């Protein structure tokens, strides 16, 4: 079994994988690596996220590039990009938790202790109405603020890190904090520092990506390009895993739901209704599904369908058909 077994991984049966089919993500040839790759891009201030997509598409001479989680033009930081076949994987990041570093400007002097007190109150579940310039309907919604860390207070400037549920508007968050302070406040600067498994560690600039591509094209050196472009499997690192047998792969590729007998192992933190990444024994992403029961219930089940397949990313025929 070629999947690394972490402490929270339940191995249901000993299994081996046939080396004649599929390919471990790290061993894909460079063309496949690019067309099934993702980039942890450091978006600069200025362009829209769609403009960045277009630049990278032209830079790499590929057909499609898409991003996971739009950033406003002036916002910098983590912008995950999917290339060609990996563009659909970006959809899985839309609901992933996000993290930002924000510079909030309070409109008049307020005691620092009061600022800390109010920001402490704006954690957990909060109510938000999207701002006027948002692309969604302006209905009252509940969002979860997982953590707020104040990094620095300098007069009317408050620098803080916020970890929040997808769909949280940090600009509106600053406005609401300002209202609670009785002084007013606005978001002066914003940088995204994490989207699901994508963090500031390993960020790639547009210049890095262009240089890496040129090294490969002109010198045949793909080392730097492989560092800049990651396997698409990286993009599901925030999801719990279900690892399946070779014999189950092609059925999933054709849209079948996953039966208990096709599972080699799974993470023990899976709850009913969770979105899970369906992986091969070689660590390839087959698709994603919705758990019909918890990990412990799956492990105890005698058989039956346990994962409803929602999206398929692997091409049918990658593994041999072993189903009727």
From Swiss-Prot:
* Record-linked Pfam families: DKCLD, PUA, TruB_C_2, TruB_N
Q: What is its EC number?
A: 5.4.99.25
PUA domain segment(s): 239-314
Q: Does the keyword tRNA processing apply?
A: yes
> SUPFAM superfamilies from the entry?
Pseudouridine synthase, PUA domain-like
List the Gene Ontology MF annotations in alphabetical order. Answer: RNA binding; tRNA pseudouridine(55) synthase activity
- Catalysed reaction, written as an equation: uridine(55) in tRNA = pseudouridine(55) in tRNA
Q: Does the keyword Amino-acid biosynthesis apply?
A: no
What processes does the entry annotate via GO biological process terms? box H/ACA sno(s)RNA 3'-end processing; mRNA pseudouridine synthesis; rRNA pseudouridine synthesis; snRNA pseudouridine synthesis; tRNA pseudouridine synthesis
Keyword tags: Isomerase, tRNA processing
**Which residues does the entry assign to the active site, renumbered to this chain?**
72
Q: What does this protein do?
A: Could be responsible for synthesis of pseudouridine from uracil-55 in the psi GC loop of transfer RNAs.
The record's similarity note reads: Belongs to the pseudouridine synthase TruB family. Type 2 subfamily.
Name of the protein this chain belongs to = Probable tRNA pseudouridine synthase B
Species per Swiss-Prot/TrEMBL record: Methanothermobacter thermautotrophicus (strain ATCC 29096 / DSM 1053 / JCM 10044 / NBRC 100330 / Delta H) (Methanobacterium thermoautotrophicum)
Name of encoding gene: truB
